[in-house]
Structures are given as C-alpha cells and as structure tokens.
UniProtKB/Swiss-Prot annotation:
NCBIfam families: argH. One of its GO terms (cellular component) is cytosol. GO terms for biological process: arginine biosynthetic process via ornithine; L-arginine biosynthetic process. Its EC number is 4.3.2.1. This is Argininosuccinate lyase 1. Coiled coil: none annotated.
Length: 466
C-alpha cells in the first residue's frame, strides 16, 4: 500500500494542508492497534451485511466489500499487507487497502458508522476473545493444582502466619487454597464477559444515526447478546477494558503470592519443593546455582499488570462524554496485560505440574515452632473445661518451658506439663503429634485429609461443568 494515500484523504476535506510529521507520529496507533485487524474486519463485514439487508447499500456493493475485506484478512495473515503510519490506525489502513482493491464501493462501508463505534466494537471483541483464553488457562492451572492436592492430601507441612510456623496443615490443603482463589478469578472472567456482551456498533460518532440501521442484527452477527442501549455510553466508556484489567491484576496478584511461596519453598533453607530444570536457570559465575527465575518473573510481572490497571483508570478518570483521543491509550495497556497474564498462567501451570515435593522436609518443618500449641489449648478446654483464655495462658507457659528446655512441646514430660497444670494427663500427647493435629481439623473447609478430599471432589465436579 502506498503512503501517497494519507490520512488527510480520509478525513481531511475541511483541511488546507496535511498534519505535521510530529502530529502524525503522536497520532498514529497502527504500531499496536494492528492487533485488532481480525476484529476490525469481522465488524466491517457484519456492518456491510446489515447495510445491504436494510437497503442502505446495494447487495452488489456489499459483496465487493466482503470479498475485499476477506482478501485483506488473508494478506495480513500472510504477512504481505503493508501497514502505513500515515494512515494512523487499523481502521484507515484497512479502508485504504479496500479502496485499492474494489474502488468506490469501499467508500460505502463507513455509512452510518464512525471510528468511535468501530474501535469500541473492535476492542470489545478482542477483550471478549481474550477473556475466553484466560478462562481456559485458569482451568488448566486449577486442574494442575487439584492433581497436586489429591497427591498430597495427607502430606503434612507447617501453616504460617507472619511467616512463622503457626499450625500444621497439609500440602493438599495449601494447594486447595489457591484452587479457591483461581476459581474466583475464573468467576471474575465470566462476570466480565457477561457485562461486555453488548455491541456498541451503530452508535456512530456519539448520537446514533439517521439511517435505518438494525443494531440488533449486527450485535447477533458478532456474537453479542444485544446492542448497548445508549449511544453516548457505547462510544465513551472503557469499563469493559477496566473489568478485564482488574481481573488480570487480581489474578496476577494470586499468581505472585504462589510464586513467592515457590521461591521460598525451593530454597535449601526450606527444601519443600524442587523446581524442574524446565522452569529454572543457572548462574553465569556460580555453577552450583539453580535459580527459580520463572517464579521470580511471575512475581515481577505482577507489578506490570497492576500498573496497566492504574494507568487506564487514570486515563479515564477525567474524560467528559464522549470520545477523546486519550482513549487511544487503552489498547497498549490491555494488549500487554493480556500477553503478560497469558505467560504467567502458562508458566505457573508448568511449575506446579513439574515440581517435586519433598514430603519429608515438609513433615519435619511442621513439627517445629511449637505448631501444635493450639491443639494443647483446645485439649485443655475440651478435657479440663478451662475457659479458652485460661487455656491460652497455660499453653503459653508450656511453650515457654519447652523453649527453656530447648525441646518441642511433645518432648516435654508429663511431669513438666503437670507442673503448669496438675489436671493434665498422658492423653495430652495424642494431640501434640502433628499428624493427629491435622486429622482432627475436620470442620468444613478444614485441613483434615478427609475434608481436603471432599473439597477436591467438589472442585473436580465444578470444573467438569465449567
């Protein structure tokens, strides 16, 4: 395509001269909005079909338009299409090439349409498609976590608060916590799809059009539930993009938390897991190193995704109705966040699937830090009838004694414990073992292996219907 066809020829009837070079540079978006080519062509074909069906253009012109657009689609996908920055964006690049191919009939395509509703429908279609991709990726990650949870439903590990050993849990239970988080992310994706499932096409510049168009027809042709009900809203808001970015930011934050734990667990000091070579790198100077770079990059890229949400919120916060060129800044945020999230989900699914779990190291760590202290307090309440606050105090004294003797709680003698409360009997030792502590947590959603397996069965059924 020749640069002789400038943007000035598309909208420049009232201008005496073309834009300055710097204006063309700052105004052009083709370097990134070319990603919308498939959606742009899809929307244009649906629009042309509606124009013909309502008698606004002839069937002959519509057939030429559709044939030309399909030719352009093939050119772009083959890599032979010549994009021009002087034509600003994907819409005008496609329209200019269409004019090259079919002549004056191309000029009828933009009847009853503005670039304002055109870009709104293009981006909405793209984001909707991306939401479906994210949903599938999330299902893959949840499946990987469920497999790990099932494998390690009874594998004991320490549960932490403030990064201090708090109570014993199972690794399966820990994995299921992330299943719940990512399942909510999946729900957020679906909620976003539901809200964005309306077509802005036909709103034209902002006020609608005097042509007898059929917006319901184009909405259906493009796979939307219905057309948007207000033409001003149709072209002026980007909350569907913000919905996507908010979902992406929350999901990325969940991924980052899991990545942080993987990084910690894979250190020699913890030794809970070993990442596969496929998701690790080495050092250029230290030959012994095996670095958890995939997890670190997931953690690092979260800031990038979160930044895109804040960036677009900031763009939109001062926008009066309806359209302003500020909105051109929506696309790079969305495109980069989507690409980044796709990578993060794929990397995390791979790490979870391939990592080796060191159950022995987890079990050993689970007994440290007096992790069964709460079990001791609960036993005092159940067996001796102590108020919980008094039981908490007695247990605290037992912990202090254990630390003084440099032993774990279960290594204290019965005499030691009776020196704190004479009512304590030898039965206390059954609750101080970490395995028994875990088995006793049978409340709904608890860490007992029996309860973890119930939750695994529940989510497997839910996922099968998803």
């Amino acid at each position: 395509m020749s640069d002789k066809k400038t943007s000035n020829q598309m909208w420049g009837g009232r201008f005496a001269s073309g834009p300055a070079a710097i204006m063309e540079a700052i105004n052009a978006s083709i370097s990134f909005d070319r990603k919308l080519y498939a959606q742009d062509i899809r929307g244009s074909i649906a629009h042309s079909e509606m124009l013909a069906q309502t008698g606004i253009i002839s069937t002959a012109d519509q057939e030429k338009i559709a044939h030309g657009l399909n030719t352009i689609l093939k050119e772009i996908e083959a890599g032979s299409f010549e994009f021009s920055t002087r034509l600003e964006d994907i819409h005008m690049n496609v329209e200019a090439r269409l004019a090259d191919l079919i002549g004056s009939a191309a000029g009828r395509l933009h009847t009853a349409r503005s670039r304002n509703d055109q870009v709104a429908v293009d981006l909405r279609l793209w984001v909707k498609d991306e939401c479906f991709r994210v949903a599938e990726a999330l299902k893959g990650l949840i499946t990987a976590l469920l497999a790990r949870a099932e494998e390690h439903a009874a594998t004991v590990m320490p549960g932490f608060t403030h990064m201090q050993a708090a109570q014993p849990v199972t690794f399966g239970h820990h994995c299921m916590a992330y299943v719940e988080m990512f399942a909510r992310d999946l729900s957020r994706v679906r909620d976003a799809i539901e809200r964005m499932d309306e077509s802005p096409l036909g709103a034209a510049a902002l006020a609608g059009t005097s042509f007898p168009i059929d917006r319901h027809r184009t909405a259906k042709a493009l796979g939307f539930r219905e057309p948007m009900r207000n033409s001003l809203d149709s072209v002026s808001d980007r909350d569907f993009a913000l919905d996507f970015l908010a979902m992406a930011a929350i999901c990325a934050t969940h991924l980052s938390r899991l990545a942080e734990e993987i990084i910690i667990w894979s250190t020699p000091q913890f030794g809970f897991i070993r990442l596969s070579d496929s998701f690790s790198t080495g050092s250029s100077i230290m030959p012994q190193k095996k670095n958890p770079d995939a997890a670190e990059l997931v953690r690092g890229k979260t800031g990038r995704v979160n930044g895109h949400l804040v960036g677009l919120l900031t763009v939109m916060k001062g926008m009066p109705l309806t359209y302003g060129k500020d909105m051109q800044e929506d696309k790079e945020s969305v495109f980069d966040a989507a690409e980044t999230l796709d990578l993060m989900l794929a990397a995390m699914t791979g790490m979870v699937s391939d990592m080796t779990v060191n159950a022995a190291a987890m079990k050993k760590a689970a007994g440290s830090g007096h992790a069964t202290a709460t079990d001791l307090a609960d036993w005092l309440v159940r067996t001796l009838g102590l108020p919980f606050r008094e039981a908490h105090h007695v247990t605290g004294r037992a912990v202090a004694l254990a630390e003084e003797k440099k032993v774990s709680l279960e290594k204290l003698s019965l005499e030691d414990l009776q020196s704190i409360n004479p009512g304590i009997t030898a039965d206390i030792f059954s609750v101080l073992a970490v395995q028994n502590s875990v088995k006793s947590r049978t409340s709904f959603g608890g860490t007992a292996p029996s309860e973890v397996r119930k939750q695994i069965r529940y989510w497997k059924k839910r996922l099968a219907k998803a």
